[in-house]
């Protein structure tokens, strides 16, 4: 694909194309990181990117750049074709769609798929080998159901969803439009509900359901549990990484992002636009306000106000955590000082 053709495609996108210098208008075969790119590949740089130094000797064919004069001057001096955009990372994502367009599977039903006669599969949907779809389930139009997916009874899947190999949707689960459930993810599994008795643990029946609103993506190996009653709800546009556990009765707002190994205990309430970094834990019934950011391994035991940035275990304001971390490294020296003071203090 010629760089000039790619520029025309970016003009219709959302990355804010400002201007471009086509140079020799390279024919691009793909994309790569700047320090690994070849003459027929595209790359990008953001302001302050650690790879900026690589631009002086990179073999890259074309670049997406921020409006940063030193980078523009260097690219011009080296004769590299480039485009200046408001958001280079977003432009790169749009460019990858152009350079590597997805090939949709043919819209048919594989002969090894097992579909209950009371299930409905919408037009334009592709159902791959060894898929199982239970009674009363409805799969919308233009969906892609990859091999080995199991859809239990009474599941409703809206239009344009994609279920990757071996994903499992338990009874009563509801998926909005354009949801993606990746391989080995489980939606609607039984919540961890048991009642202690004199004879041991008595299982609490989990009769609720899981609802994924429009545009939710669930990573590989993640699980979203259904509650005993009511629902577990994931807000529209929320993105869930691999190996995330979301407990029964949790609700999240719109546009959240949860990184790998996040664990959210039952009944927690997560606001809109919340970002939880890797291995963050949220306690049972904790309320996390809108736009909260929690750094990796933070343990959220109590409610967190909207807009807060928290770190540490238990989670505290990030700036306070930085001061505590700095003090922690000085504890051995402080302990020695205290011991010396005790030795030198008359009893």
Swiss-Prot record:
Pfam families: Hexapep, LpxD. GO terms for biological process: lipid A biosynthetic process. GO terms for cellular component: carboxysome; membrane. It comes from the Bacteria. GO terms for molecular function: N-acyltransferase activity; structural constituent of carboxysome shell. Its EC number is 2.3.1.191. InterPro entries: Hexapep, LpxD, Trimer_LpxA-like_sf, UDP_GlcNAc_AcTrfase_non-rep. Pathway: Bacterial outer membrane biogenesis; LPS lipid A biosynthesis. It catalyses: a UDP-3-O-[(3R)-3-hydroxyacyl]-alpha-D-glucosamine + a (3R)-hydroxyacyl-[ACP] = a UDP-2-N,3-O-bis[(3R)-3-hydroxyacyl]-alpha-D-glucosamine + holo-[ACP] + H(+). Belongs to the transferase hexapeptide repeat family. LpxD subfamily. PANTHER family: UDP-3-O-ACYLGLUCOSAMINE N-ACYLTRANSFERASE, UDP-3-O-ACYLGLUCOSAMINE N-ACYLTRANSFERASE 1, MITOCHONDRIAL-RELATED. Catalyzes the N-acylation of UDP-3-O-acylglucosamine using 3-hydroxyacyl-ACP as the acyl donor. Is involved in the biosynthesis of lipid A, a phosphorylated glycolipid that anchors the lipopolysaccharide to the outer membrane of the cell. Homotrimer. This is UDP-3-O-acylglucosamine N-acyltransferase. It comes from Parasynechococcus marenigrum (strain WH8102).
């Amino acid at each position: 694909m010629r760089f000039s053709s790619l520029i025309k495609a970016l003009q219709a996108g959302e990355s804010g194309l400002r201007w471009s210098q086509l140079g020799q208008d390279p024919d691009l075969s793909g994309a790569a990181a700047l320090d690994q790119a070849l003459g027929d590949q595209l790359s990008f740089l953001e302001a302050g990117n650690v790879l900026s130094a690589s631009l002086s000797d990179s073999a890259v064919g074309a670049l997406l750049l921020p409006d940063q004069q030193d980078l523009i001057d260097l690219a011009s001096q080296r004769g590299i074709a480039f485009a200046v955009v408001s958001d280079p990372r977003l432009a790169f994502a749009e460019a990858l769609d152009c350079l590597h367009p997805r090939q949709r599977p043919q819209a048919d039903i594989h002969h090894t798929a097992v579909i209950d006669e009371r299930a409905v599969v919408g037009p334009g949907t592709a159902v791959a080998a060894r898929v199982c779809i239970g009674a009363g389930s409805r799969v919308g139009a233009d969906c892609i159901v990859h091999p080995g997916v199991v859809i239990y009874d009474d599941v409703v899947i809206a239009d344009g969803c994609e279920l990757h190999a071996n994903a499992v949707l338990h009874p009563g689960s509801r998926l909005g439009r354009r949801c993606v459930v990746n391989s080995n993810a489980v939606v609607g599994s039984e919540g961890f509900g048991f009642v202690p008795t004199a004879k041991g643990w008595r299982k609490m029946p989990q009769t609720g359901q899981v609802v994924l609103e429009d545009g939710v993506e669930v990573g590989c190996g993640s699980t979203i549990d259904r509650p005993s009653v009511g629902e577990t709800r994931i807000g529209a546009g929320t993105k869930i990484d691999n190996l995330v556990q979301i407990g029964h009765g949790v609700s999240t707002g719109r546009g959240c992002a949860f990184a790998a190994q996040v664990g959210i205990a039952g009944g927690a309430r997560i606001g809109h636009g919340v970002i939880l970094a890797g291995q963050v834990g949220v306690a049972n019934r904790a309320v996390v306000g809108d736009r909260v950011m929690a750094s990796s391994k933070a343990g959220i035991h109590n409610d967190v106000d909207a807009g807060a940035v928290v770190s540490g275990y238990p989670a505290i304001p990030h700036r306070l955590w930085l001061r505590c971390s700095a003090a922690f490294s000085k504890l051995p020296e402080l302990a020695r000082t205290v011991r010396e003071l005790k030795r030198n203090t008359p009893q």
